[in-house]
Amino acid sequence: MSEHGIKWACEYCTYENWPSAIKCTMCRAQRPSGTIITEDPFKSGSSDVGRDWDPSSTEGGSSPLICPDSSARPRVKSSYSMENANKWSCHMCTYLNWPRAIRCTQCLSQRRTRSPTESPQSSGSGSRPVAFSVDPCEEYNDRNKLNTRTQHWTCSVCTYENWAKAKKCVVCDHPRPNNIEAIELAETEEASSIINEQDRARWRGGCSSGNSQRRSPPTTKRDSEVKMDFQRIELAGAVGTKEELEVDFKKLKQIKNRMKKTDWLFLNACVGVVEGDLAAIEAYKSSGGDIARQLTADEVRLLNRPSAFDVGYTLVHLAIRFQRQDMLAILLTEVSQQAAKCIPAMVCPELTEQIRREIAASLHQRKGDFACYFLTDLVTFTLPADIEDLPPTVQEKLFDEVLDRDVQKELEEESPIINWSLELATRLDSRLYALWNRTAGDCLLDSVLQATWGIYDKDSVLRKALHDSLHDCSHWFYTRWKDWESWYSQSFGLHFSLREEQWQEDWAFILSLASQPGASLEQTHIFVLAHILRRPIIVYGVKYYKSFRGETLGYTRFQGVYLPLLWEQSFCWKSPIALGYTRGHFSALVAMENDGYGNRGAGANLNTDDDVTITFLPLVDSERKLLHVHFLSAQELGNEEQQEKLLREWLDCCVTEGGVLVAMQKSSRRRNHPLVTQMVEKWLDRYRQIRPCTSLSDGEEDEDDEDE
């Protein structure tokens, strides 16, 4: 192989780079990637189109179904010169027309008859193009799908394209028409498709002239008349159509350039469900793909089949829609093993990313000696009151998908830690719900953001702020931590002293935990998070570590109140958030929106409007003992009355008619962040569309069958 042959040419600047280069040396453009996704080749009658293609070039001798655009692959030699040789030039405007055109496409001038001395090659009539190799990725694009159209018959009711062996439409169950009607319908569609393909190729011009060459079918009289009428009509809007095609082509190219291997495998699996190809689903599963993944707007646009694909659809939705019972059994098994969940952050990834950017923009660092990071916005997440308007079966499905039932059971039934007061949970509408989140070391950060903004800390924005605050304000937090640990040990009768080096080693370990994504966090990190939020954090948790046999191993020390004591009180909010702790896992505890009743609590006239939701969070446990306040200094430590006084200074407290000391958490849908409100509405719309009488496994009816 020569030196020229082993190099790859850049698709932007045409510079020839060495094979080891992953980017262009001149313009730094990314090296084009090859074919990624393959599936079994179609068994069509027009398989001779790709006869010169070697199946061994792809894995398993299969041909690709969905792959990146041809612009993202290494360039192949174009057949542009061959196409131009077969075209005839108009004697009026010199436009190069297709050989079968009897009039000029641009000026509609009559084609001149061939001169007796003119060679067949120059005129283009009667000459046959030389066979060439077809790009496998372009063999199955929209233009070459004309060759496989004979395998399908179109339903006369819903226009769905069914396979040839289907006796009735798989969407609407309409019986297949007789052979004469089917042939006429197929001919009509083929004629219109040919017209559209000619139009597309003409407006793309030289940009698309290097694509796969097609063999033209014999032109009938009816086709000629239709094409002539179509050409006359389209000339008026030619410029606008060309610009729209160019914009659409550029947009699709940008989307394809952002796609990764997993994305192509997912799209291939979606098409595999529609076409009945189980191998595509197996390929996606074997790559570690998420079965519950949903289609985005860009992916739907790339698939370009609105009748089959819609935003938010999963593989399960598609299997139900197209009645793939064998695939549905496999997919539902996978989803059940993953204990499928659907929280608001999962429904709309685009809104979730915008919320993450809002959080990052609202993080600022305080100037001065105490250079701690803080959030500028006060946001409290609550479950929408519209949930109660849903049918009972739909409500049960919603709670199964958004709540952590195991945590809820452990905090409510196994130990009376939350919702133990009937007065708070029922009469005052302050029942707490444990939201599901990732069961990893990031659960504390996830639960904090879920209790405020309703999303995960996926990009570790909050973890980075936590680490930077601990590092920049290390002296302040270290002093509080050291004094608290010494007092806590002495309160249990453990009288010991550590060298300063040992204290420093333990503190360095706490700092290292904050910088490692996925690392479990401790009480000190909750104390720092209270300063970042500028609001108190109340943790309701189990008191003891237990083994798998149920044996008590030690105290957990997480339950209690964490106040932002190092800030000024005027700089902080008094509305707290609540977290739950069970066996090494944190969960966000949120309430449901209520009507904002007045005069709730003994002598407490709230004087609030109906839009404000007030949740009463108990500051005592089920035994009516005051919750511990963590990280108090020696001057702030005292008896229970002094700690209650401190709580009243940092929280809006009141006593209910039952004598329970509570803190008021206030939230308002109208004053909440609009992105959070929009995300919750989109999530709730998913359940509003579910019919209560459904018998489908995923709880959704196929609402669009009649629109197909």
From Swiss-Prot:
Zinc finger map (RanBP2-type): 3-33, 84-113, 149-178
Top-rank taxon: Eukaryota
InterPro entries hit by this protein: AnkUBD, OTU_Deubiquitinase, OTU_dom, Znf_RanBP2, Znf_RanBP2_sf, ZRANB1_OTU
Domain notes per entry: The RanBP2-type zinc fingers, also called NZFs, mediate the interaction with ubiquitin and determine linkage specificity. RanBP2-type zinc fingers 1 and 2 (also named NZF1 and NZF2) specifically recognize and bind 'Lys-29'- and 'Lys-33'-linked ubiquitin. RanBP2-type zinc finger 3 (also named NZF3) binds 'Lys-33'-linked ubiquitin and shows weak binding to 'Lys-6'-, 'Lys-48'- and 'Lys-63'-linked ubiquitin chains but it does not interact with 'Lys-29'-linked chains. The OTU domain mediates the deubiquitinating activity.
Binding-site residues, Zn(2+) 2: 90, 93, 104, 107
Disulfide bond residue pairs: none
Polar residues bias: start-end ranges: 209-219
Binding-site positions, Zn(2+) 1: 10, 13, 24, 27
GO CC annotation terms, alphabetical: cytoplasm; cytosol; nucleoplasm; nucleus
Keyword entries, A-Z: ANK repeat, Cytoplasm, Hydrolase, Metal-binding, Nucleus, Protease, Repeat, Thiol protease, Ubl conjugation pathway, Wnt signaling pathway, Zinc, Zinc-finger
Localization per Swiss-Prot or TrEMBL: Cytoplasm; Nucleus
Protein function: Ubiquitin thioesterase, which specifically hydrolyzes 'Lys-29'-linked and 'Lys-33'-linked diubiquitin. Also cleaves 'Lys-63'-linked chains, but with 40-fold less efficiency compared to 'Lys-29'-linked ones. Positive regulator of the Wnt signaling pathway that deubiquitinates APC protein, a negative regulator of Wnt-mediated transcription. Acts as a regulator of autophagy by mediating deubiquitination of PIK3C3/VPS34, thereby promoting autophagosome maturation. Plays a role in the regulation of cell morphology and cytoskeletal organization.
Entry-linked PANTHER family: UBIQUITIN THIOESTERASE, UBIQUITIN THIOESTERASE ZRANB1
Complexes and interactors: Interacts with TRAF6. Interacts with APC.
ANK repeats: 260-290, 313-340
UniProt family annotation: Belongs to the peptidase C64 family.
A GO term for molecular function: cysteine-type deubiquitinase activity
Main location: cytoplasm
Reactions this protein catalyses: Thiol-dependent hydrolysis of ester, thioester, amide, peptide and isopeptide bonds formed by the C-terminal Gly of ubiquitin (a 76-residue protein attached to proteins as an intracellular targeting signal)
Ranges where the record places region Disordered: 38-73, 202-224
Residue ranges occupied by any OTU domain in the UniProt entry: 432-592
This protein's name: Ubiquitin thioesterase Zranb1
Listed EC numbers: 3.4.19.12
One record GO biological process: Wnt signaling pathway
Catalytic residues identified in the record: 443 (nucleophile), 585 (proton acceptor)
CDD domains: OTU_ZRANB1
